[in-house]
């Protein structure tokens, strides 16, 4: 697999992570280096590990995984996005915004944004190509674009406030819907 192909796949896979990071950056105030590291590291790590997992499992479970992966991603993204929209409408004095770079929220977002990378790993296995270089590049690109998305999201959050939090939640829901439609109606 040539470098241009690997880079193209990496950027395409990182787009969901970038969009989620944009939404996360809009709701975290102030964003610290810890936030950037946690989300960038975990999104990059999951994006790198999923193709390896797909490659290792190969064709043995492809039918089972492909039947449910889109539902898992849809459910996770709609849950987190819905919670963001709900929190945007809560009273400010009662509100302690949840940090999407911590705990189960971070894990759910990491899994949801990297499920497509698992399918790429299955494809790489079918090609008989080593997964190690593509997985490394996929992880690095996802990590860098996640940090860039958070920084851009912070600027939007400072300027537009709650509207960006609502939009961010809706974007997560729409990404989930897009994944679901791509794997069901548009197949």
Curated annotation (Swiss-Prot):
GO molecular function: manganese ion transmembrane transporter activity
Its membrane topology: Multi-pass membrane protein
Residue spans crossing the bilayer: 3-23, 39-59, 65-85, 103-123, 124-144, 166-186
Localization of this protein: Cell inner membrane
Organism superkingdom: Bacteria
Record keyword Membrane present: yes
Bridged cysteine pairs (disulfide): none
GO cellular component: plasma membrane
Any Pfam family: Mntp
Membership in a protein family: Belongs to the MntP (TC 9.B.29) family.
Name of the protein: Putative manganese efflux pump MntP
UniProt organism field: Geobacter sp. (strain M21)
